[in-house]
Amino acid sequence: MVIYPWLKNTTELTIALPKKPIIHANMDVLGSPRGGTPTGEHEINAQDGSPINFSPSPDFCWLCDELFIKLEEVALKKKDLGKPRKVRNLEITSNFVSLWRKTVGNDIYPALVLSLPYNDRRSYRVKDVTLVKALCKHMKLPRNSETERRLLHWKQNAPRGVKLSTFCVEELQKRRREPVVPKRMSIDEVNGMLDKLEHESNVGKWSYISLAESPAFNYCLEHMSYVELRFFFDIVLKVPIVSGLESLLLSCWHPDAESYFKVVSDLRIVAHTLYDPNERLEKNDLSVRIGYAFAPHMAQRVKIPYEKVSTKLGNDFYVEEKMDGDRIQVHYMDYGNSIAYFSRNGINYTYLYGENSSKGSISNHLKFVEGVKECILDGEMVSYDKEMQCILPFGLTKSGASHQVNFETTGHTEPTYRPLYAVFDLLYLNGQLLTNQDVVKRKEYLEKILIPSKNVVHLLSGPRCSDAEAITAALGAAVAHGSEGIVLKKARSKYSVGKRDDSWIKIKPEYLENFGENMDLVVIGRDKGRKDSFICALAVTDDSEKNNPSSYESGSDSDSDSEPIIVQPKIEKFISFCSIANGISNEEFKEIDRLTRGNWFPYDERKPPTDWVEFGTKTPREWIDPKNSVVLEVKARSIDNEESKSDLYKTGSTLYNAYCKRIRHDKNWSTASTVAEYDTAREARSYFNVSQNAKFGKDRSSPRKRRTFHLVGDIDVTKPSKADFLKGYYFYVTSGYFDLQSKKNIDASEIGEAVVSCGGTYIHNLRIRASLDKLYILGCKDTRELKMLIERGYDIIHPEWLMDCVKYGTMLQIEPKYVYSASEELMKQARNQEDKYGESYQLPVTEDTLKALANKQVEEGYASEMGTDAVSEYERLLIFKGWLFYILDDYAYHSSWSDIVKWNIESCGGEVTNDLELATIVVAVKDCFSQLSLQAVRNNIGARITGSNDVQPIPKIVTSEWVEACMEAQYLVDEDEYAAI
């Protein structure tokens, strides 16, 4: 039965492109040539309108000498260039392009694919270790030889700009002469050998032994010069030949080539479509096509209440579970004879999941109803544990696929987890583009044609909803199941290629004590020491170049069917944002040093241009141009808005407890996080803070026990206190204090609760509220912030005054003991509140007060002996300070293990509670909790979300290994890596 009229339509889809078609007769849909000789594989048929080179393919050594070597020399030379490096690079590349057009022809694809190997669609499955071991075997060296070990650890001593290929060639030079051949290999011959190498790597078992015995690989070793081999190794490893060459080479070839490549992700299409620089692309020339990767539609994270979210989506939307995996698009072609898998960045993962319906961990389970010839699916690839029957955390997807492929190929032990593909969209079906159809239609088509396979291919569907209550219920259910969150999709929205808008909205649980966003930051400064500290920056972009977001009333739908062009915002400069030292291993420190060696400038001798790099008051010993730097993925506990740090970094705020997760080798200065992205993330996080500050101390009680007071004297304790006696007054708290009577630390959050409970206003940012008349600044610790406030003329009151006001239920007069720093006028008024013996006129003298006075000298003496630096060092060890832990342990006979975890937490400043609702984080003691108890905790947390229409903060659930990891690292490590499952 034919469900839809186009299911039996075998007519090929015609793509509208500027004058020249892009589908070639001798090319398969993945862009890999079919058959032919090495030379003929890269010739283009004149009948299909593609460009033809009028001269034979030039030698590969000519490409190396004319382009690669010259650009390398410019990169290595710091002086004596005679002109700026950018200008020299542009001259070299433009001259090469001009020579190619004049002496070879208009088809630059053969050279382009060798110049940009990391953008080549071919996969050789060769890593550093594979190449090193294969070369050692080729040189007939014993296993684990000194040469092999030296090559395997090449990064440790490699200077900047030197790659593994250089060391490999040096070892070859020591053991043999350079090959003497009658004829050099041409560019087409090199491409032909690479085609054969790709074929060999995808047939049967592939290892370093297979590479060493590969006919194609050995042919190149025996017919290439040392210079050619160096670049050949780079091509096989898919590492950049020359940094920044992609943008330069594409732009020199055609003014639209770089923008077009971001959409089609295929060098062959770019080269064969844009060969005439006089023919320019138009906006409507971009569309999804079968077999070619594209940028997917991304969900936006918003900062508004759920009622407004529902209104923004037209009160008609789908709710889907947000999966924690890799965004993968599947291109199903020729009834399953050809299948391709692409990531959101256009990386081809077909080798992991199967190139046709008869092989692979996913492809052989991908089934459709009769009549489906070709289609494009959008979904998420996750890891599924078959024994526990649950989705595993992100990071195991590719390894799960590799293990499954190995099991199906060799029959070895079956892995416990495997990849699962969750499909949620259909974009193309039998020649018909569906991106201009709304979500309702696309889901209807998808449900009709896809046949799910249990635990392998899953149809990710969700209810169609219309109100905020459905959002909270869905988020609560997602949390109860341990999911990452939910995605809301406007029912009438279209699929916007390469766009992030609010027709798709993602909602994640707001976690306590967590900023919640990973940021990719460029290193711009360094302070060398026993442990280097890096100053990282955000990019300031030109707002005029950003895409205008959809208006609140109109949503995000457009009547136009044309696909948008992705415009990268123009970066104006970089401004300092935070300092990073934690989370970077010794190997990563060496890697950063290797990648940036030779590009650092002493700050005192040569300051950076402020129109490109700008620091706050905190300046480094050395700075680096962002274009020559590295990008770090950074995560933080929260945003730090302290007044004292507002000038340290040019952004005006910084990150608290920030640490590095990894070096982002796939990012550079042009793709790092921007100030606009940071502001969006900060506003999204602060929405919860704003809504909760309004009820600070009402809905959440302090976890500490309240003190009971037995007062003697003039104040009648039986008289009820006035609940709003602080109304109209504003309070800014810089620190807590140690209460001598209760022998406990009173932190700033408790003081804030006390302020709000008595009608006062607790402010977080002094900069925007400094002009208030009835403003009290509370603090007693000698911090940088307090020193700055004192220098600016502010009166500082001890926090004990506020707590005594709450204690006695009235606004007390300021006495000398409550003054930390004040003007002479205020001190004169304060002295009038006590007698000549220093006793208060308004407060009673109690037994506790006398004891506190007796112990005061001892406490002050001990603190002075420690010194400010010692106290600060001690506080840095309290990594869990301010955190409240709920310990999950339902096996009584392992109580000693729980006691150890509890002791570790409390020794680092944390506290333990038996009330789950008060917990900042839940720690499941390893091997001491059951799935039943874990699910009960999740259900409790999920019910908390479901029962409220406001954004509710919830604790993360980790294993006790997280506590141990934090103590070992001496900072808060990423909770996601220790999630309890």
UniProtKB/Swiss-Prot annotation:
Active-site residue list: 322 (n6-amp-lysine intermediate)
Keyword set includes Repeat: yes
Enzymatic reactions: ATP + (deoxyribonucleotide)n-3'-hydroxyl + 5'-phospho-(deoxyribonucleotide)m = (deoxyribonucleotide)n+m + AMP + diphosphate
Region (Disordered): 544-563
Classification via CDD domains: Adenylation_DNA_ligase_IV (cd07903), BRCT_MDC1_rpt1 (cd17744), OBF_DNA_ligase_IV (cd07968)
Keywords: ATP-binding, DNA damage, DNA recombination, DNA repair, Ligase, Magnesium, Metal-binding, Nucleotide-binding, Nucleus, Repeat
E.C. number(s) listed in UniProt: 6.5.1.1
Primary residence: nucleus
GO biological process: DNA biosynthetic process; DNA recombination; double-strand break repair via classical nonhomologous end joining; double-strand break repair via nonhomologous end joining; maintenance of rDNA; nucleotide-excision repair, DNA gap filling
GO molecular function annotations of the record: ATP binding; DNA binding; DNA ligase (ATP) activity; metal ion binding
Covalent S-S links between cysteines: none
Highest taxon of the lineage: Eukaryota
Residue stretches making up the BRCT domain: 721-819, 875-980
Pfam families hit by this protein: BRCT_2, DNA_ligase_A_M, DNA_ligase_A_N
Binding-site residues for ATP, renumbered to this chain: 320, 322, 327, 380, 424, 484, 489, 506, 508
Residues noted as binding Mg(2+) 2 in the record, renumbered to the chain: 484
Entry function: DNA ligase involved in DNA non-homologous end joining (NHEJ); required for double-strand break (DSB) repair.
Protein family according to the UniProt entry: Belongs to the ATP-dependent DNA ligase family.
Protein name: DNA ligase 4
Source organism: Eremothecium gossypii (strain ATCC 10895 / CBS 109.51 / FGSC 9923 / NRRL Y-1056) (Yeast)
